[in-house]
Amino acid sequence: MELYTALLAVTILCLTSTMGVSGDCSTNISPKQGLDKAKYFSGKWYVTHFLDKDPQVTDQYCSSFTPRESDGTVKEALYHYNANKKTSFYNIGEGKLESSGLQYTAKYKTVDKKKAVLKEADEKNSYTLTVLEADDSSALVHICLREGSKDLGDLYTVLTHQKDAEPSAKVKSAVTQAGLQLSQFVGTKDLGCQYDDQFTSL
């Protein structure tokens, strides 16, 4: 079974990488109602903090991604950097936005930095991303990873539009409201992150 990265995820948050979780996803996760979707589907996001609820490996990852939505279809360009091995990998994802709010289930192709497809999406693997909070500068998202009909566990990520920026007071409050503490999260600021901003510019 493939293990899943802790950084998507942005999302992210790639179904072909090496950081994973196992166990059922939380069943009481729903998108925050009334959120302006433009707050999330605008600009580039950097994962500054992540919480893997059941980690299996110790490699640390950096990630950035750009989500866009048009007529209910979400498309994302994701970049991941393994801070331990100094390696990069790239994905293009696509999914459908749920009618209930800022929540979508996506599948991903593995591509190179020029976006040429290296591996088509595995139809049995997906993740559902739920936006718990978002404002002009930062966001909190929950991700449920799946292989077929089996949940592989919960992943929370804090996103900001600026590299190494702290989340807003509103997003910090959302972390607390989710029953979590930001101190539980792994911060990416000191990992020596590298990014490919050209790739993530849709």
UniProtKB/Swiss-Prot annotation:
Additional detail: Demonstrates antithrombotic activity in rat models of thrombosis.
Coiled-coil region list: none
InterPro entries attached to this UniProt entry: Calycin (IPR012674), Nitrophorin (IPR023613), Nitrophorin_domain (IPR002351)
Protein name per its UniProtKB record: Nitrophorin-2
Phenotype when changing V47E: Reverses orientation of heme cofactor
Highest classification ranks of the organism: Eukaryota, Metazoa, Ecdysozoa, Arthropoda, Hexapoda
Compartment(s): Secreted
GO BP terms in the entry: vasodilation
Signal peptide: 1-23
Binding site for heme: H80
Keyword Glycosyltransferase: no
